[in-house]
């Protein structure tokens, strides 16, 4: 990962930054041109169809900066001789489906996911509609720093607009074998939806109305003026909780701005828990199609236990969707994802998809004939605490190694940072892929025990970091 500046971060998964300021210090128009052209050069190197220009699918969430970022991205790619299909307001999984659906060479998603409205980003997809591998991402970064040649005037590309893909995405979900539209339609559900005033305000109600669900909209106007911090955490979802109880809803649904994260609020206003979105979907999928499951190292133990209930194996992967997908392919997983509410169902496609998650979850809920809170009570109950600290200018990996050597009461996994599995819980410490921070996640039988693990290991890491000097490796 290359930190170009405090608020401009380039990594193998894309570039993100805050809008405004000088070039190289935030996400400026010149930075967008530089990175989009690096990606375009990579697309051109891979393209071998002499009868047509390369095609890239572009979609965006509703961020205020989205229109000008889109215009620059599309214009830059056109100037390189690449045709663009612009989906307009869209979702990350919608673009992922559209890339192979249009036989395109790649895709660009303009979204900073759960980051606040001042952030935006370019996320990069290959011709399968999946995030780039480490090698491909590094190649794009290298090309972005090089001197690039653009197309002659007669060879420039064009941009066409296609706003049909949200409906195609909904139709795709309804056609999945393990989604039962008729059962959901017959249940007469009432659901509150908080889409943080982004593109989920279009996509989620479109799916729910196709399932005969009465929708109570909460922040569903896709203006990009986020009504609260867009990360779907309990402290940010007070309006959704209030709507669920005030309107006597069967449940509430929250998605992040680009609709790849999904969490639920139960009918009594309690939080189902974003960690348990994947757990519940796994319960449904494994009951019908048993097979291996995968989640990342920072996800709840409950998935492992629910997998075991169905006689299935569980494997942990490094954090990051591309790592989870790679591990899923290695073990032949039937389902995977991340504990932040990201469901990856490869029967659909190899990417986190909140719409797919909604279809599978509602099918499970109506098939059980339970309330949302009663369903939650059927799963192992763990508590998670998520903390972080600023990334210091020292060798963090060395400090983690010292910490690893001194801990004797845990099983250790150092594939991605260091995870300590203890008898009654775990703690995972790692450098973030997207922000200049160290993430510290812990899980235990109770909130107090999880917090105690965070306090213990965070304190030990701070002690080791303070003893180090010199530049970060």
Report each predicted region and the residues it spans.
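An N-terminal, well-structured beta->alpha segment
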Residues: 2-75, 79-80, 159-191
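Gly/Ser/Thr-enriched, mixed-charge loops and adjacent short helices
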Residues: 18, 120-247
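N-terminal small/polar loop signature for handling phosphorylated ligands or for N-terminal nucleophile
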Residues: 41, 45-49, 54-119, 206-265
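Proline/glycine-rich low-complexity loops and linkers
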Residues: 78, 87, 138-171, 175, ...
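Short beta-strand-to-turn element immediately C-terminal to the catalytic PLP-Schiff-base lysine
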Residues: 124-127, 263-267, 344-346
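Gly/Ser/Thr-rich active-site loops/lids in small-molecule metabolic enzymes
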Residues: 133, 217-219, 270-290, 354-367
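Phosphate-binding and adjacent anionic-ligand microenvironments
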Residues: 249-251, 289-473
